[in-house]
């Protein structure tokens, strides 16, 4: 697997290669269990104050999530691109609402921003079901 690939694409190819020879979970539930395990290891490293170990565990978590995408026949790059676009849309909504209220983002509370975020989600959901 070429080392020049973006990390997420390379992880997908590495996991696909391993799966082809049987080094894999029987189904997506096994991968989800692995994701939970890796997330717990991130938390343990953070609780121990070990930033370097936490970063290593985040890498393991990302790799496990890439495996989940593979078991769902999803392209992890496309999944992330879609989520990036969704995040950007919603964050622009938050910015727009605060701007309309003449409220600088830097002065808005997290609760206030979260309320606008949830409104953006609700608006998206309503427009997709219309």
Give, region by region, the residue ranges found by the protein language model:
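Flexible "arm" and connector segments at domain edges
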Residues: 1-58, 62-130
